[in-house]
Design a protein with these regions (language model features):
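Catalytic cores of nucleotide-sugar-dependent glycosyltransferases that transfer UDP/GDP/TDP-activated
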Residues: 1-320
Length: 320
């Protein structure tokens, strides 16, 4: 999402630099890099998991990034790191902090609470409510968006797709169970995010990690994409990408799913944690007009719309 936003702003004539780790590649955008910290993996936030341990290497990398940012004297900073040091390092800068996750980490909640509301955004109305309930006055919602790319025409295969990172909160077991109940073979696409997570994918075709274009093409050929997440997901890019490929989505009705899936038009929502309800949603998805699915996504989930929102917010902060 960060790369897409940067490219979108560059195409509108803005000068943009991405501060990131060595090895990153974003053609068309200037990159200012730091070495990847050795403890980056242990700093990952795991929903429903144990709190992430201290990661001094990550804090040092963030400090190095912000040293470079300050020396470049930018008009405004779009900050997407979900780490308390990132908020601290940005003090005094014209910065917009996007909260891509719920208020899971006490240190991040405290850092966000001490940041002016006008400098805070989150990605859905669901997350806005969650952060405000945690005592953080978030000033705006800036929804994610996905690029509209050409996808193959033709009838989809009689297959269900489960896509995203391989981790407990994604509910892969429920998705596969519901697919079986609906009589659909399943494919699973995604990289392992939580090495400790041992999931049984027996009976499903394992596609592994795909490029974004490869995944979009698989979505275009799939009868339905199943999103059986077990937590209040902040947005749901997989669901958005599937709809943009014309693939309807069957999802649990929780988190931002009602904002991302247009129930009855681009997919169907199911009772959370109820695989029978999810199977029924899958079956109903097979009756939807895939052209209408894609049209719905273009209206609501476009990358251009997301860039519009960020451009307006960043210019407002830069001029304040």
């Amino acid at each position: 999402m960060v790369c897409d936003l940067a490219l979108g702003l560059v195409r509108r004539g803005h000068q943009v630099a991405i501060h990131c780790v060595d090895g990153s590649e974003v053609p068309g955008v200037d990159l200012i890099t730091v070495p990847p910290p050795r403890d980056a993996a242990q700093a990952l936030v795991m929903p429903r998991g144990r709190p992430a341990p201290q990661a001094p290497g990550v804090a040092a990398a963030i400090a190095g990034m912000f040293d470079a940012i300050r020396s470049s004297r930018p008009d405004v900073v779009s900050q997407h790191a979900f780490d308390a040091p990132a908020f601290d390092q940005a003090r005094g800068l014209a910065a917009l902090h996007t909260l891509h996750l719920p208020p899971l980490v006490p240190a991040v909640v405290a850092a966000a609470a001490s940041t002016p509301a006008a400098q805070l955004a989150t990605v859905s109305a669901s997350m806005l409510r969650a952060w405000r309930a945690a005592g953080v006055d978030v000033g705006r919602v800036l929804r994610n968006g996905v690029e509209d790319v050409d996808v193959p025409d033709g009838a989809p295969e009689h297959l269900a797709l489960v896509a995203g990172r391989i981790s407990p909160e994604k509910g892969i077991e429920d998705a596969l169970t519901a697919a079986r109940l609906a009589g659909l073979p399943a494919r699973v696409a995604g990289a392992v995010y939580d090495p400790a997570y041992d999931v049984d994918l027996q009976g499903a075709e394992r596609l592994g990690e795909l490029t974004r274009l490869e995944l979009r093409r698989v979505m275009a050929r799939s009868a339905v994409t199943i999103c059986a997440v077990r937590w209040d997901e902040p947005f749901g890019l997989v669901a958005a990408e599937a709809q943009m490929a014309g693939c309807p989505v069957a999802a649990y009705d929780r988190g931002a799913a009602p904002e991302v899936v247009e129930d009855g038009v681009s997919g169907f929502l199911a009772i959370p944690d109820d695989t029978d309800s999810l199977a029924a949603a899958i079956e109903r998805c097979l009756t939807l007009d895939r052209g209408e699915v894609r049209a719905s996504a273009r209206r609501r989930l476009s990358l251009a719309g997301a860039v519009d929102g960020y451009e307006s917010a960043l210019m407002e902060i830069a001029s304040s």
